Amino acid sequence: MSEVPSPEEIFEKSREEGERRLTRPFGELASTALAAGFDIAAGVILIAVLAAPLEHHFGKDAASVAGAFGFGVGFIFLVVGRGELFTENFLVPLAGLHGKPRNAWWKIVELWTVSPVANVLAGLAVACIVTTHGVLPVGSGRVLTDVAQKIHANGTLALFMSAVFAGALITAMTWFVEGHDSVGIRLTVAWVTGAFLALAHLNHVIVVTIELIFGIRYGAAIPWDFVVGNFFLAAAGNMLGGIGLITLNRFTQAKAGSGGGTRKASA
């Protein structure tokens, strides 16, 4: 038997972590976001190095599944290394605002501007390094070019709706991870979420931007104005899904709860 924390307990843990994030210095925020960008770039690389050799033997579909689960390792790095993606700074910092003065909102603005920029800069740096000819195995460029072109082929409405769900998914992951002390549970949730994101090609602002950068570096005919435009489109959709669908609902759940403490669940 294992203890499942109540929504009130998860909210309290999130509030405490949110307060910490809202009071840390700028340097810590920036370095934490840079680390997260590296983690995601590592996951994108794993898509390529796993899928490329499998395509010939098992076909593109099976290779894509393997690559997606490889990408999930990037989310394991994210949780183990305590990096933070832009979308992980919805639920937790907003919980940390509870009972704080209005000027605390400036820290939220700082989080929501510094985090995505640092995430992407780290991913860009990694992409520039590893897309140098001969660094990654043969076929890696083809895989990542295909990934980028699939994203580019989507229409605006599809990209936005995909972004809404991506934001909700990552924010739900944040809630689950914050709610458990078990390292095994935290890593499993992170891995499955990352794989889900990659399998469905969801429009996560940081993940997709880094994937597009890799694709362009390998020769994908995708204009940079699409990358920039989708960045803002995805950010808006991620915020709508993460805050509107998950954060507000979970806060309401915690507030309306009876405070019954932990519940027992089968292991």
Question: Residue locations for each model-derived region?
Answer:
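Alpha-helical transmembrane segments and their helix-helix packing motifs
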Residues: 1-267
